[in-house]
Each structure stands twice: as structure tokens, then as C-alpha cells.
From Swiss-Prot:
This is HAUS augmin-like complex subunit 8. Its main location: cytoplasm. The keyword Coiled coil applies. The lineage of its organism: Eukaryota, Metazoa, Chordata, Craniata, Vertebrata. It is found in: Cytoplasm; Cytoplasm, Cytoskeleton, Microtubule organizing center, Centrosome; Cytoplasm, Cytoskeleton, Spindle; Cytoplasm, Cytoskeleton, Spindle pole.
Length: 367
């Protein structure tokens, strides 16, 4: 690779040297100015030494000797590496627009304007340079995938027909299963709705029965309590009548003794209780006498009572009629007096003068 990369560089260097010598001769003939030869033209003389030095730097893993020591290669020792890169540079890279001001005019000619070499400086950092192995060029024919030339085992037609029939049967069965499943789902939904309705009805009946049961239990408890009260109060019923009589006598005695009588102007001899006892005896005597007198005159008193009642009704009616007639008489007298006063006023106004009438009805200050 190194020899192949150096060979074209050498030819180009010779051509460039020839061209540069011709230019120098023209310049001498024109003006006689001093021409400095380029060091780049000396690459052909030290071909063998440079190749051997490049091989040693690439293959060996040792350090590069320091600059200034004996036998160290100078900047020109990198020419083989530059030659390798320039061999693969395309034609558009030879344009002069890619160079910068840092490029020396003495080292480059018009025919050798190329891009800067990509220098590998791993040797300076004690690293071995690995030789880049070229990759084989892959053509378009090689990129095409290779077809499998193995023979394909063909399936017999009977097997294909059998598989098709089985697939048809399976599809039919799946469709039928789906239809049956859909029908069963609808039936299950209807059954669930019916079950829910029945559940609601049963819950309502259960609530009604629970309420009736609680009412019955409460009635039974009340009945038991009433029976127990009857059992306890039955002996009291026999003593109810004497208790009632005793209670009435006690109430009357309490009423008579609770309120004090107005005895302010009554002379009482002795104790008050003794006076009440004597008074009670006298009242009992008067009661017996009245009972003896009343039966003989009861019929007469009833007849007289009826007549007195009728007379009372007649008196009430006459009283009402008299009150009504009296009101009517008062209204009539009021109207008569009013009419008489109006007539007398009219007669007086007619007989008297207007000035006098004006004084009667109006203030004297008015004109």
C-alpha cells in the first residue's frame, strides 16, 4: 500500500519539478530574480529512507525520538503518510479555496494544492498506530440476497381440500356458538329482570309481615298487662260502692269545713264545731217538715207553675212589643219636631229682613 501510494506522488513531484524549473527559467530570462527551491521537491531523493522510517513508526510501539537528536526525521518524514492521503483525495479537493493563510507558499505549488493531511498523532502519546485495513468493495450484485434454491415440499390437493372443509366447519360452528351465546345472554337478562322483580315483591311482603308481626307482639304485651291489672283490681271492685259512699261524705264534709262561714254578726255560744252540730240538727228537722208538707200540695203547685210560666211568656212578649212601639214613637216624635222646626225657621226668615238673617248665619265682619 505504501509503495502504491508513493508512486503517483513521485510522478507528480517530477512533473511539478519540471514545471517549476521551467517557470524559474522564464523568471530568470524576464527579470533575474532569485528563486528559492521548494523542499517538497526533494521527496524523490529520500524515497527509500522515508518508506523505511514510516514503516518503523507505524509498526513499532516505542516513542518517537525527540527533535534535534541524531537521526530523527524532520517534517519531511511525514510525506509518505501525506502521499497516502493525497492518493485517495477526489478532484474537487484540489481547489485552491480550501487553503488558509497558514499554508506556506514555498512548500505548495499550483499543481499540488490539496487538503491538509489528517495526521495521526497517537505516536506522540505513546500509542501504537494501527494499520487501517481496507474494506472489500461490495458490488450491487453481491448486495442482492441469495435465493433459497432448496426444493419446496408441495402439499397434496386432498390435504388442502380437507383443511378447507375443516376451516369451513369451524367457522360455521363458531358462528353458531356466537348466535347461541347471544340467545342465551338475552334469556339470562330476561330471567335476571324477572328475578329482580320477584325479589322486590318478596321484600315488600316481608316488610309488611314484619310490621304486622310487631303490631301483634305489641297487642299481646298490652293484653297481658291488662289481664294482670284485672287480676290485681278484682278484689277492689267489691269495695268500690262503700268507698264511693265514704268518699262523697268525705267530700261534703271537706267542702263544709274548708270554707269558713261569715259569722261576724252572729253570736255563737261555745265551740264552733258544737254550733255546727246543732245547726245540722235543726236543718234535718226543717228538711223532714218540708218533706211532710210538699206531697199534699204538689199537684196544686204543678198547675200554678204552668200558669205562672205561661204568664211569664206573655209578659216577655208584651215587653218586647212595648219596647218596639216605644222606639217607633220616639222616631216619629223626632221627625215631627224636625219638621216643625224647619217650618218655623222658614216663616221667621220670610218675615225678617235679609240683613238680620245675614247676622244670624254669618260673622258680622263680613261685608
Amino acid at each position: 500500500m505504501s509503495e502504491a501510494g508513493v508512486a503517483p506522488i513521485e510522478d507528480g513531484s517530477q512533473n511539478s519539478s519540471g514545471g517549476s524549473s521551467g517557470d524559474a527559467a522564464l523568471k530568470k530570462s524576464k527579470g533575474g530574480a532569485k528563486v528559492v527551491k521548494s523542499r517538497y521537491m526533494q521527496i524523490g531523493r529520500s524515497k527509500v529512507s522515508k518508506n523505511s522510517l514510516a514503516n518503523t513508526t507505524v509498526c513499532s510501539g516505542g516513542k518517537v525520538p525527540e527533535r534535534g537528536s541524531g537521526g530523527t526525521p524532520t517534517r519531511r518524514s511525514l510525506a509518505p503518510h501525506k502521499a497516502k492521503i493525497t492518493a485517495a483525495v477526489p478532484l474537487p479537493a484540489l481547489d485552491g479555496s480550501i487553503f488558509t493563510k497558514e499554508d506556506l507558499q514555498s512548500t505548495l505549488l499550483d499543481g499540488h494544492r490539496i487538503a491538509r493531511p489528517d495526521l495521526d498523532l497517537s505516536v506522540i502519546n505513546d500509542r501504537t498506530l494501527q494499520k487501517i485495513t481496507p474494506r472489500p468493495v461490495v458490488t450491487s450484485e453481491q448486495k442482492k440476497p441469495k435465493r433459497d434454491t432448496t426444493p419446496v415440499n408441495l402439499v397434496p390437493e386432498d390435504m388442502v381440500e380437507m383443511i378447507e372443509s375443516q376451516t369451513l366447519l369451524l367457522t360455521y360452528l363458531t358462528i353458531k356458538m356466537q348466535k347461541n351465546l347471544f340467545r342465551l345472554e338475552e334469556k339470562a337478562e330476561r330471567n335476571l329482570l324477572l328475578v329482580n322483580d320477584q325479589k322486590d315483591q318478596l321484600q315488600e311482603t316481608i316488610h309488611m309481615m314484619k310490621r304486622d308481626l310487631t303490631l301483634l307482639q305489641r297487642e299481646e304485651r298490652l293484653r297481658d298487662l291488662i289481664e294482670k291489672q284485672d287480676e290485681v283490681l278484682t278484689p277492689v271492685v267489691t269495695s268500690k260502692d262503700p268507698f264511693k259512699d265514704n268518699y262523697t261524705t268525705f267530700a261534703t264534709a271537706l267542702d263544709s269545713t274548708r270554707h269558713q262561714l261569715a259569722i261576724k254578726n252572729i253570736h255563737i255560744t261555745g265551740n264552733r264545731h258544737r254550733y255546727l252540730e246543732e245547726l245540722q240538727k235543726h236543718l234535718a228537722i226543717t228538711k223532714s217538715l218540708l218533706e211532710e208538707i210538699m206531697p199534699s200540695h204538689a199537684s196544686e203547685n204543678a198547675e200554678s207553675f204552668d200558669t205562672i210560666k205561661d204568664l211569664e211568656n206573655i209578659v216577655l212578649k208584651t215587653d218586647e212589643e212595648l219596647a218596639r212601639s216605644f222606639r217607633q214613637i220616639l222616631d216619629l216624635s223626632f221627625k215631627v219636631n224636625k219638621e216643625i222646626s224647619l217650618q218655623s225657621q222658614k216663616a221667621v226668615e220670610e218675615t225678617c229682613e235679609s240683613a238680620l238673617v245675614r247676622q244670624w248665619y254669618f260673622d258680622g265682619s263680613l261685608p
